[in-house]
Every structure is written in structure tokens, then in C-alpha cells.
């Protein structure tokens, strides 16, 4: 597999690549080496307005929202096939801009991205309305209709996969969308927007605006012509989108907010080796940058020493290295600020009682 890739860096509005209206750009950094990968077009408020307007026109006038379910299904299946054909390219982008191990990108993220689009495509002609019980002289129907224009706000930990989780149901039900990728990981989302056109998704159905949460994200959250916001990210930012909705048009807000879960091992656990396998996988996979990562380990005192010894040994199998190396299991964290936050949790100055079973690996 080639280790070179060309990056598209412009906004996608109405099926066209466009620079930001104010001419601003921001840098996407490779977290593995700190080098600039690309300068990405930064959307302004005017660009957000244009993207929403184009999405609104595409929704109201069709053809996507008015397309026969069987035809929409064909187009979405073709979209999945096009993404699949470019899986290596997208995997390279994600490894380079997010620091994700290339093996995970190829074997987990890209298949999940394709399968999500494909699953929702197959569901299109299997969605039925209902007839409710009523008087014989009355026909009472429950009809499901598309919502309209959806703003989809993506996180940086699974860029392509999260784009698919948003795009699948949004497109399958006839809506149009304005995608806002995380500023750390814009490149694969832009490319997916380009591939949508290749697959035959009509212009204006998928738009991509890049930039920062306090400007682009806020503009989408407050926009009066956005019917729904679908957000994945922090609880703090999720609350902001609820406020934006309350202060404007009461748009529907769908939140998937991050959280951390404890990994609990009871004293009567019979297979500690398997428990140690799961414990290491749950915290180290995807560098722990996962909303279901088990960042706390709650262990019964009677098995603590034995389990920790197993975990320390198994952690040695998690090779830290270049995300483009197929042998790497742990790449870099997304950015320096995030690394600093994680390292603060094991700061001996702040936690004087802390005893580390092994040395931190920071390069």
C-alpha cells in the first residue's frame, strides 16, 4: 500500500469544492510527527448560511427527498461501494491525521463505515407507515416523513465511521445534511463528500463545512433553517447545542455524549487471564480515545496483585509506534493538549499516593 496520498482541503457546498469566503485556512497536523499535513479551508458564517440554503433547496425541490425508495436504495448502495473502493486511501488519511493504527483503520474503521451505509441502504424499502385503530368511517394513518436539513457534528476519534453513522440514517430517510468534521480530522470527511458525488448522490444533499466549534458549530446549532442537529462529542459541548436549540427554533437535537466506564473484576472471577485481556483491550484500543473506553479498573482486593501483574505483562504486547506501521497497536494521541490532559492524571505532584506499575511511554 502506498504511503502517499493527495488531500482535498476545500469546503463542499452544492456538490462543488469551494474555498472559505473569507479566505481563511487552518492547519491539520500529523500527531505522529507534529508536521503539517494540509491547510484546510475554514468556513465562515456566510459559508454556513450558503451550505444550509443549498441543503434546504435540495430538500424542498428534490430529487433526493422525492426519490422512490428503491432508487434511493440503489444510490446509497453505490455510495457504499465507492467508499469501499477507496478504503485504503481513507484509511491512510485517518492514520495520518488522527494517529490511528493503519491496521485498525483497514480492518475495523473502513469496513464499519461501508457496512453502516450499506445497512441503512438496505433498510430504505423496509420502512413502513402504520394505520391506527379508528372508527370505520375514518382512515387514520401514521406517516413518517424526513425531517429536512440536518447538521451533523462529528468527533475526531472515528472520523469516517462517525460520518457513516450520521449519513446512513440521515440519507436513507430522505434528508439533506451539512457535515461539520472535527477541526483535527477534516480530510477524510471532505473526501467522503467528494465520493458522494461520484456515487450519484445529487448536489446539495451532502455538504461539508470545516472549522471550529465556537464558530462553525455554533452557527449550525443556532441556524433557524436547520431542522435537526446530530452531535457526537463531549457532554459540555452537547449542552451547548441544547441551549442553541432552546434560544432559536427549538430544532431537534440528537446527542451522543462521551463518557467513561469502569471495568469491574469481582473476587470470584475464575479466568483472570481473559479478564486481563479484556481490560488491556478496553483501555489501550484506539489509544483510549473511545467513549466506551474503560479508564477505571475496579478490582476486588483478593485478586488485585495477580490481575495487575497479568495486565502489565499483556500491556507489553501493545506496540507503540508509527501509525503507518502495520505492527503498531497504539499510535499517538490526537494532539498535545489531549496528551497533556491524560498525563496530568498520573502527575506525581497532584497524586502523591500514586504508584505506577510501569513507566509512561511518551516520546
List where the protein language model places each region.
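Glycine-rich loop-to-alpha-helix module at the N-terminal edge of alpha/beta enzyme cores
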Residues: 37-127
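Single conserved hydrophobic/aromatic residue that forms the stacking wall/gate
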Residues: 351-363
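Hydrophobic packing residues within well-ordered alpha-helices of enzyme cores
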Residues: 117, 189-192, 220, 241, ...
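Structural signal for hydrophobic packing residues in well-ordered secondary-structure cores
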Residues: 59, 63, 80-87, 91, ...
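Terminal low-complexity tails and localization/encapsulation signals of metabolic enzymes
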Residues: 1-40, 74, 78, 127-153, ...
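ALDH superfamily catalytic-core signature
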Residues: 228, 236-354
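Rossmann-like NAD(P) dinucleotide-binding subdomain of oxidoreductase/dehydrogenase enzymes
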Residues: 128-274
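Residue-level signal for inorganic ion chemistry
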Residues: 34, 72, 94, 174, ...
